[in-house]
C-alpha cells in the first residue's frame, strides 16, 4: 500500500489545512441530517489539497456512498445510468441518506462528452440525496452552468509548514530519521501539493533508514514549473537539462508554445536566431497536430523537445537583459474579433443553406463576394436572396445598398408568346361572335317561303345567287 493511502486522513481532525472549509462542511452535514436538503457541495482546488479525501470523510457521515469519476463516464447516457437513478430514488421504509460523489467534473473534454454537463445538471436538479462534486480548475467553462446550482468551497494549497509537519509524523510512524531542513525542502518543492510531497518522501526513503541532504540532492526535481518560469528558462538559458526541467508544467503544452512564440522576438535580437526559433516552433506545432489527428499523444514528447531545448539552442548566446514577458496575443485577438467572426459564420451558414455548399467553401468565396458587391444592383439582388442584415452586408461593402430603379418590363411569358397570344385572342373573339349569331338564328322562327314581287337591285340579286336553291324549313332538315 502506498503511503498516500496508508496515511490518508480518516476524519476531519486529521485533515491538514483548510479548516474554514471543514467548518462549512460540518454545518452542511448537520443540515442534511436535520431533514433540511442543501445544495450540492462543489469542492474546487488544485491537486493534492484533499478534495477527494474530504469527500470520503463526508461519506462516512451517511449510510452509503456512490462514487463516480465524471471524466470516465462522460456521456449523458452513462452518467444517467450510473448516478441518475440512484440520486432520484429513496427507499419507502428506510430514510437513510446516500452520498453521491462526482469526481473531476471539470475533466469532461472532447466531442465524446456530449450531454455530460447537461446530465450533471439534471442529476443535481432531481437528486434527493446529498451530493459532493470535485474539480481542479475553478475557471473551467464546464463549471459555468454547474456553479449556480452548488455551494462552492475553494480549497487552498496546503501551507509549507503544515506539509512539513505531516511529513514529520509519517517519518516517526515509519521509523525513518530525517532532518527538519530536509522535510522543509521537500514541503517547499511540493508547491502546496501534500500528496506529491508524501510520494517524494516515500521514493527517497525506500530501503533507507535515514534521509540526508545527499539523498535530497539525488532526488532533486521540480514537480511543476510556473508557465512564465518555463518561458524564461527556454529563452534565457542554453542548458538543455535545465530547460527540460522547466518545461514540466501542468498547463496545456500548446499554450506554452504560444507563450514562447509570443516572446521570442522580445528576447532574441539576431534575425537568424529568431528564424531558427520559429522553425523549431513550427515543427513542434506539426507534432501537436499529428497527436490530435491520430490520438497518439506520444508525439507530444517530440514537440516538447523542439519547443524547449530546440528554441533554447536557436540563439548563439544568452542575453543578460531585462525583458517583460507577456501572454499570448492570440487570446486578445480572438476577443477583439469575436463579433466579426460571429458575423462571418452567420453569413457562411446562410450561403451554405441557399447554395447547398459547406460553410468552409462559403467562407472561401468571400473575396469574390466583395467584388460582386461593388455593383449596386448585384449587391441588392444577392443581399435579398441571402436575406442579409445590414451588419452582415458590411462584411462585403461599407456603404449602404440603395434599391435600384428598374423599368417595368413585360412578363417573360408575354414576351415569348405575345403575338401568338393576340392572334388566338382575336380568333376566339370571332368564334364567340359566330356562336352567338348561330344561337340567335336558331331561336328565330322560320318564315314560309314566298316569292317577293318587289324589285331587287343588283346587290340583292348577287346575294340571292349565293343562297342555296332549296331553303331549310326545319332545324332537323339538311340538304
UniProtKB/Swiss-Prot annotation:
Residue ranges, annotated region (Disordered): 402-479
Pfam family of the protein (one): AAA
Gene3D superfamilies hit by this protein: 1.10.8.60, P-loop containing nucleotide triphosphate hydrolases
Keyword Transmembrane (UniProt): no
A GO molecular-function descriptor: DNA clamp loader activity
InterPro entries reported in the protein's UniProt record: AAA+_ATPase (IPR003593), ATPase_AAA_core (IPR003959), P-loop_NTPase (IPR027417), Rep_factor-C_lsu (IPR023935), RFC_lid (IPR047854)
CDD domains, per the entry: AAA (cd00009), HLD_clamp_RFC (cd18140)
One Gene Ontology term from the biological process aspect of the record: DNA replication
Superkingdom of origin: Archaea
UniProt keyword annotations, A-Z: ATP-binding, DNA replication, Nucleotide-binding
Record-listed ATP binding positions: 45-52
Compositionally biased residues, Basic and acidic residues: 423-442, 449-472
UniProt function note: Part of the RFC clamp loader complex which loads the PCNA sliding clamp onto DNA. The complex possesses DNA-dependent ATPase activity which is further stimulated by PCNA. In conjunction with PCNA stimulates DNA synthesis by PolB, relieving inhibition by replication protein A (RPA).
Quaternary data: Heterohexamer composed of four small subunits (RfcS) and two large subunits (RfcL).
Entries under NCBIfam families matching the protein: PRK04195.1-5, PRK04195.1-6, PRK04195.2-3
Family: Belongs to the activator 1 small subunits family. RfcL subfamily.
PANTHER family on file: CHROMOSOME TRANSMISSION FIDELITY FACTOR 18 (PTHR23389), REPLICATION FACTOR C SUBUNIT 1 (PTHR23389:SF6)
Protein name: Replication factor C large subunit
Underlying gene: rfcL
